[in-house]
A protein has these predicted regions:
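Residue-level preference for short coil/turn positions at secondary-structure junctions
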Residues: 65-66, 90
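N-terminal capping segments
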Residues: 1-61, 65, 73-75, 79-80, ...
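Aromatic- and glycine-rich peptidoglycan recognition patches
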Residues: 78-135
Length: 135
């Protein structure tokens, strides 16, 4: 996943196209179809939280810790931003947009710029665990 997003040219996503990046990651790597398409630029934290609240239980569900391919939503200082989490490499990276450029940075570095960071997975996407299955 990291290699795919690194290969994209500058301008692939529009300015403030972070939600489109998450949408593309979920379509490409979780094979999801019919995801909503949002391109609102300069989304306020309040408006973003309204959208997230409206999608909870149907499209997304909050999780306490980041999982591979979860959406990372962050807000602070009147800004809202999002990206997708990759656990392909340690310590775990957030893939997001900065202007029209794809940016990949460690989660801890991403967190420092925001007051609140939350994690959401696709509501029908659950981690597969074989440790507690009985054959």
């Amino acid at each position: 996943m990291i290699a795919y997003f690194k290969s994209l040219p500058d301008g692939y996503f529009p300015v403030d196209g972070c939600v489109l990046l998450v949408r593309e990651a979920w379509q490409r790597f979780l094979h999801l179809e019919n995801l909503p398409k949002h391109m609102d630029q300069f989304v306020t934290p309040d408006y973003a939280h309204e959208l997230i609240d409206g999608y909870q239980g149907q499209l997304i569900e909050p999780i306490q810790k980041p999982e591979h391919l979860c959406m990372v939503a962050a807000s602070g200082k009147g800004k809202w931003h999002c990206g997708v989490f990759s656990a392909e490499q340690m310590p775990g990276y957030v893939i997001h947009t900065l202007g029209c450029t794809v940016k990949i940075e460690p989660l801890n570095q991403f967190r420092r710029r925001f007051d609140t960071v939350e994690f959401y997975r696709h509501a029908t996407h659950c981690r597969v665990s074989t440790s507690d299955t009985k054959g």
